[in-house]
Regions:
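PLP-dependent aminotransferase-class I/II
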Residues: 121-173, 358
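Buried hydrophobic positions in well-ordered alpha/beta secondary-structure cores of metabolic enzymes
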Residues: 68, 86, 119, 152, ...
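Active-site nucleophile and cofactor-binding loops and adjacent substrate-binding regions
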Residues: 77-84, 220-221, 256
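Active-site C-terminal subdomain of aminotransferase-like
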Residues: 156-160, 165, 206-294, 298-305, ...
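Catalytic PLP-binding core of fold-type I/II PLP enzymes
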Residues: 166-199
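Short beta-strands and strand-loop turn motifs
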Residues: 48, 151-159, 186-191
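Conserved C-terminal alpha-helix-loop-beta "cap" of PLP-dependent enzymes
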Residues: 2-7, 98, 289-290, 294-376
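Conserved N-terminal alpha-helix of the aminotransferase class I/II PLP-enzyme fold
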Residues: 19, 26-82, 93-96, 106-113, ...
Length: 376
């Protein structure tokens, strides 16, 4: 079985830098997303009159599941407290139904890069990595796969590639490849709501039309939306019923899930109408900074309310410039690079949210000049 390269993988997500954390707290403005999360901000997303559930049944959990199923045009949806739990269990259901243990996905997908190969260790699933790690998934890459697969996982947008999205024609070709082989098609839509504006503008396709291509759709409530935690998987009622059993087997059917579901419903209603504005601001930022020497924006053009920005600078110098801006301007830019790609190449992730909207593209241009070492 081929293994994917470990080159240029994201830095460990949870290693702490206390000094940088304290410096970030001292800043009055934050560039990324919605700014720092706090208990008070998260608790404010949970209404006091929330109807509680018991073991995931009833209350706001059921309300959220029904809304997500309708939003995505599926028969049913299930709330799961963890995306890691949700996706591997969903793929397990597809594999069991097709009596094959092989699944196909891009080598930079979350299951391969961030989950300690849980699909393999817990579910005895075998992965076929499709295509080069640094390039988007393509139908041409899929044509090189010559073994039966139970399911094809497609991530929209591809986070580790800066929020890259395929054209509608390319996406349909990838789905058709799986359909022609009797494989299920699963959408890793952790940031699906961030993909919506691109497909609406470029291809006049709605969220319903995107979801209709897939057997099962996973969406996160904390990544692009800023909720407390958790996700939903939507699909056919029989598949979701099986997934519910696996949620229990994974320990995910806890006594009460209502705080997570209530927060999810709040941010879903609050953030979805803003996604088009986030996308427009991301495009404006990318255009504004494209002329800075030593900077490259990925993808180009930007296709979602996020992007990766490559700075041609050493890691120590980059950190020093982040610290200088924080101390002199009380502006927090990047805690760390998303990937350190070489001695003088740092790739950072810029997700656009409410906090980012407070910065004009011109101001961000000035900040990036300083981070790149080409400005005062």
């Amino acid at each position: 079985m081929a293994r994917t390269s470990t080159k240029a993988r994201p830095l460990p997500a949870f290693s702490r830098d206390v000094e940088m954390e304290e410096l970030a707290k001292s800043c009055s403005r934050h560039l990324l997303g919605d700014g720092p999360r706090s208990a008070s901000k998260l608790l404010a997303t949970i209404p006091e009159d929330t109807a509680v559930d018991y073991y995931g049944i009833g209350g706001v959990v059921e309300e959220l599941e029904k809304e997500v199923a309708a939003l995505l045009g599926k028969e049913s949806a299930l709330f799961v407290p963890s995306g890691t739990m949700a996706q591997q269990a969903t793929l397990r259901v597809h594999a069991d139904r097709r009596q094959t243990r092989t699944i196909a996905f891009h080598p930079a997908c979350h299951l391969e890069s961030h989950e300690e190969r849980a699909y393999e260790r817990l579910h005895d699933l075998f992965a076929v990595p499709v295509g080069p790690r640094g390039e988007p998934l393509s139908a041409a890459n899929l044509a090189e796969v010559h073994e039966a697969v139970a399911a094809l996982l497609i991530e929209l947008p591809q986070r580790d590639l800066g929020g890259t999205l395929p054209s509608w024609k390319e996406l349909v070709a990838q789905v058709d490849w799986a359909r022609d082989r009797g494989a299920a098609v699963h959408l890793d839509g952790a940031r699906l709501f961030e993909a919506g504006p691109f497909y609406k503008k470029a291809h006049r396709k709605s969220l319903l039309e995107i979801a209709a291509l897939f057997d099962t759709v996973y969406v996160s409530f904390y990544k692009g939306l800023g909720g407390l935690a958790g996700c939903c998987v939507a699909g056919g009622a029989d598949v979701i019923d099986e997934l519910s059993i696996w949620r229990t087997r994974h320990g995910g059917r806890i006594f009460m899930l209502w705080p997570y579901a209530a927060s999810a419903l709040t941010v879903l209603h609050a953030r979805m109408p803003k996604m088009a504005g986030y996308y427009r601001h991301a495009v404006a930022i990318s255009q504004a900074v494209s002329d800075i020497p030593g900077i490259e924006v990925l993808p180009d053009p930007v296709q979602s309310p996020m992007m990766h920005v490559r700075f041609s600078v050493g890691l120590d110098d980059f950190r020093s410039r982040v610290v200088d801006i924080a101390r002199s301007d009380k502006i927090w830019t990047f805690s760390r690079p998303f990937v350190s790609e070489g001695p003088r190449l740092q790739r950072c992730e810029l997700g656009v949210g409410d906090a980012t909207l407070e910065f004009s593209p011109k101001e961000i241009h000035g900040l990036f000049e300083r981070l790149a070492g080409s400005g005062a």
